[in-house]
Regions:
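Beta-sheet repeat architectures centered on beta-propellers
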Residues: 1-98, 310, 314-315, 324, ...
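Small/polar beta-strand repeat architecture
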Residues: 15, 94-98, 109, 113-115, ...
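Beta-propeller and closely related beta-pinwheel folds
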Residues: 43-60, 327-340, 373-546
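Predominantly extracellular/luminal cell-surface or secreted proteins
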Residues: 81-84, 231-237, 264-269, 366, ...
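Extracellular/lumenal glycan-associated surfaces
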Residues: 103-111, 126-131, 179-184, 469-471
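Beta-rich globular "head" domains
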Residues: 221-236, 406-409, 642-659, 715
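Hydrophobic or amphipathic alpha-helical targeting/insertion segments
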Residues: 352-366, 373-374
Length: 741
């Protein structure tokens, strides 16, 4: 019999059976198609040895005016800037809690009996017990007379612990202190003694137990949840092993006791970055002794970072809903359908600076031009100079590149703090902080008229597409006086998650709840040859984790998703928009950005590391790098519809090992035989195909002799060695008919 060339149609087809898909490919992992032929995908290498805390769900790369390359990394616990293979924590501060100040005032010996608020202290006070103030009064930290701070307003002198006006009586108020003691005003002679003293009252205190490394922190209405981070300053030693240096550092909250207290694990002095090992917070604990009876002193200040988010979406309510220790004992979980949603971030550049949004949370701003930007945290956008009516909550933000407006989706309306899930607001042009519409600016808002909530939005070259849970809308810049206009372009669609949409040139691709879609001027469902395979083994409860990414070097759109039995992402499906084919594989990733600013695509592993993809040939998550197991398997093929048995005696490989780094790359060719489409493979025969020379013509195993008999056959090609790169051509087999039984 003459040799038979094995040439299969590119792409994977799982919508039918293996036998009915004769002439095609049926299964694969970590293989792509180039010009119609299968090849092993590229490898990945770690970006440095440092790691980050939490599950990464968002990446954003950009370059500053000073040519600094930055990557924004949003995780379930923090927000980092990656620079020079290090991770710099810029997570915003939710609350800074200093000691309280109890102010007592007397005028000629008459003491104040009312609230502290009856004394107004202006910021022009410049002396505290004779020393220059370094901040607001009461923050200087000077303690006299057993925890009493004496405030000396400008225009007064201190004599014998009393304050005397140095000018006219009327200048008492102008000097910075307005005093009212049950109606008694500061009147009389010039030298009226006005005494204002501040007694510092601690808000945050510590309590240690002999033999334990747990420290109980008391802070009324702290607002924290488990795994939040707080940094303490100005604490003093508890008297023993728990020194001031141990207390005055950043801590992860280990357990929430109740709304007024929580626990931390005392640890040796180190930065959180230095004790983040393989993505895990790994402190070295310090145990208290019998001398640790103090409370940390009266000057303790705590800076609380914004609450961390969930790593896994939780459905339902009541006992067991949410994460252990996120609430107090006996408290209900505030859940309607999807509670305590997954921590997602959106981020975009405003010039060289970065605007950050916690999904269904606040909007923050990071100034890349600060004197030490990597040591500077992001701040609330509303705290910027000149800020006006900045949204306090939004589901997503982006910056319109065409017209330089900041857009907030699913945000609170002007004059209200209640989130409107269908509202779009936009800032003034070129002004990220001004959101108050006036006749002289371009700030404003729009309301989407379809759906129950805005799920996501993405910018194309011409417009911004806005996705609700049932429709797609086009948001376009019109200019004054309307600024933006919006119109519906499709309804009765679905979208899997806020990150399941990707824009490539003028096309937008997205994954729905049971379909794939594309927008190229109109919305269409994408015919998918692996649709049933994907959606029949898909954990819809974790759909928020689904994300889309592009690999434009290979004309690919990738969607990463969790399989049915996994709560984390473990699979991907790829659409090649040039070849119009589909394929899939297994890979655990949390976020991905295409090459552009960086030389390679960057992806976040679930192990706390970032990786350069399409870099090398191996799995760089291990040390040393390990092999990537890659394979592709054909559908069954036969002779004459399988009426006769077939006998295969020889395989003539056709493969290239171009660019492999190992000197002897090798793949395994396996022929499988079946008698019936639903039966098991009765025989397999595999042979290694090994490269032997590359000059002048690449040489490898000429032929392999096998003995295989069955009604139908399938070909499998696989590799599991390091340094391997291969691309399959058109192998041939020596096959002949061999009877009917």
């Amino acid at each position: 019999m003459p040799l038979t060339k094995l040439q299969f149609q590119p792409g994977i087809n799982k919508e039918t059976t293996s036998y009915s898909n004769e002439g095609g490919w049926f299964d694969m992992d970590k293989v792509r198609f180039r010009a119609g032929f299968p090849e092993k995908i590229g490898g990945w290498t770690k970006i440095g040895t440092k790691s980050f805390l939490g599950s990464c769900r968002a990446l954003h790369a950009w370059k500053t005016i000073a040519l600094d390359n930055y990557v924004g990394v949003g995780t379930s616990e923090k927000y980092y800037i990656e620079s020079g293979q290090g991770y710099y924590d810029i997570t915003p501060i939710r609350l800074t809690q200093p000691p309280n100040e109890n102010i007592d005032v007397s005028i000629d010996g008459v003491s104040a009996t009312g609230e502290v608020g009856e004394v107004e202290i202006s910021l022009d006070l410049d002396e505290v017990t004779g020393q220059e103030a370094t901040g607001e009064v009461g923050r200087v930290g000077i303690v006299t007379n057993d925890d009493v701070m004496v405030i000396v307003p400008d225009g007064f002198v201190e004599e014998n612990d009393a304050l005397f006006a140095t000018g006219e009586v009327g200048e008492v108020v102008a000097g910075g202190v307005s005093v009212s003691v049950e109606g008694v005003s500061a009147t009389g002679e010039v030298s009226v003694p006005i005494v204002a003293i501040t007694t510092l009252v601690p808000v945050i205190t510590f309590s240690a137990t002999n033999g334990s490394n747990e420290i109980t922190v008391t802070h009324a209405e702290h607002g924290a949840v488990a795994k939040d981070f707080v940094t303490f300053t100005e604490a003093v030693s508890l008297g023993g092993n728990i020194t001031a240096a141990i207390l005055n550092q950043e801590y992860e909250i280990n357990e929430i006791v109740n709304s007024d207290s929580y626990k931390i694990i005392a640890r040796q002095v180190a930065s959180v970055a230095d004790i983040t090992v393989d993505g895990v917070y790994t402190p070295t604990a310090v145990t208290a002794n019998a001398s640790d009876t103090g409370d940390g002193g009266i000057l303790v200040t705590g800076a609380y970072q914004i609450n961390n988010g969930l790593e896994t979406s939780v459905f339902g309510n009541g006992w067991g809903a949410g994460t252990w220790s996120r609430g107090t004992w006996g408290s209900s979980a505030s859940v309607d359908l999807l509670t305590d949603t997954l921590r997602l971030w959106t981020h975009d550049n405003f010039g060289e600076d970065l605007i950050i949004n916690v999904h269904n949370g606040g909007i923050f701003y990071w100034d890349a031009s600060a004197s030490t930007p990597l040591d500077t945290r992001a701040v609330a956008l509303s705290d910027l100079a000149g800020a006006s009516n900045v949204p306090t909550v939004a589901s997503k933000i982006l910056v319109s590149d065409v017209d330089r407006h900041v857009l907030a989706f699913g945000c609170n309306p002007l004059g209200s703090s209640t989130q409107d899930p269908l509202l779009i607001r936009f800032s003034d042009q070129e002004n990220a902080a001004d959101w108050t519409p006036t006749t002289t600016n371009t700030a404003g808002d729009l309301l989407v008229g379809s759906g129950s909530r805005i799920v996501t939005a993405t910018e194309t070259k011409q417009q911004t597409l806005v996705f609700t849970d049932v429709s797609v809308h086009a948001l376009q810049f019109l200019g004054p006086p309307f600024t933006f206009g919006i119109n519906m372009i499709s309804e009765n669609i679905t979208v899997a998650s806020p990150n399941s949409v990707i824009s490539i040139e003028d096309s937008v691709y997205w994954m729905g709840k049971n379909e794939f879609y594309v927008y190229t001027g109109r919305v269409q469902k994408l015919p998918c040859t692996v649709r049933d395979f994907v959606f029949s083994d898909y954990n819809e409860a974790q759909a928020e984790k689904v994300f889309a990414s592009s690999n434009t070097a290979y004309s690919e759109v990738w969607w990463f998703y969790p399989s049915a039995d996994s709560s984390t992402i473990d699979r991907y499906v790829v659409y090649n928009y040039v070849q119009n084919i589909w394929y899939y594989g297994t890979l655990a990733r949390g976020a991905w950005i295409d090459r552009g600013i960086q030389d390679y695509p960057i992806a976040a592993g679930l192990d706390g590391y970032l990786y350069y993809h399409e870099n090398g040939f191996d799995d760089g998550s291990t040390a040393p790098a390990s092999a990537i197991a890659a394979h592709i398997e054909s559908s069954q093929f036969d002779i004459g519809d399988g009426n006769n048995f077939s006998f295969v005696s020889r395989i003539i490989p056709d493969i290239t090992f171009r660019n492999s780094s190992t000197s002897t790359p090798s793949v395994t060719f396996t022929m499988k035989a079946r008698n019936f489409p639903g039966g098991t493979y009765l025989q397999t025969d595999d042979e290694a195909v090994t490269k032997t020379a590359s000059v002048p013509v690449e040489q490898f195993t000429n032929q392999s002799f096998v003995r295989l008999r069955g009604r139908s056959m399938a070909l499998r090609v696989e590799s599991s060695e390091t340094g391997m790169s291969w691309r399959l051509g058109s192998p041939r087999i020596d096959i002949r008919q061999d009877g009917r039984r």
